[in-house]
Amino acid sequence: MNDESSAKMFAALSSPVRLRILLWLLEPRAHFPEQQDGDLVDDGVCVGFITEKIGLTQPTVSAHMKKLAEAELVTSKRIGNWIFYRPQRKKLKILGNWLLCAADNSSVENSTK
């Protein structure tokens, strides 16, 4: 993980709204109802459900989701007329390992290999 990608991830996570959404996406069955289209885990959560749960407008939620996607913390998938989002668990694990190494004063460079 390079400095630029780390900075994008931290910037995306600096918003309480984006952080909350990401935490919900990590446990979609606990936070969202079953969907007519797409599996909550395999396909992701429909942006409509995210919008309803967070209580913001759809354009605002889409802007937040774009930031998370640009930081490679979520992926998106179109099913019919809707966009579904799911977390990039591998990227989140890399970020977590990077933080642990930094906290332990270990080599951060070695944590991304």
Question: Which residues fall in each region the model found?
Answer:
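Short leucine-rich amphipathic alpha-helices used at interfaces
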Residues: M1-D3, G38-D39, A69-E70
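Alpha-helical residues within the helix-turn-helix
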Residues: E52, A63, A69-E70
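Short hydrophobic/aromatic segments of transmembrane alpha-helices and their interfaces
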Residues: M1-N2, I50, T75
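Conserved segment of winged-helix/HTH DNA-binding domains
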Residues: N2, S6, E27-A30, F84-K113
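Beta-hairpin "wing" of winged helix-turn-helix
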Residues: E34, E70-I79, R86
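N-terminal helix-turn-helix DNA-binding core of bacterial DNA-binding proteins
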Residues: S5-A11, V17-T57, I83-K90
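Core alpha-helical elements of the protein kinase catalytic domain
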Residues: L23, K66-K67
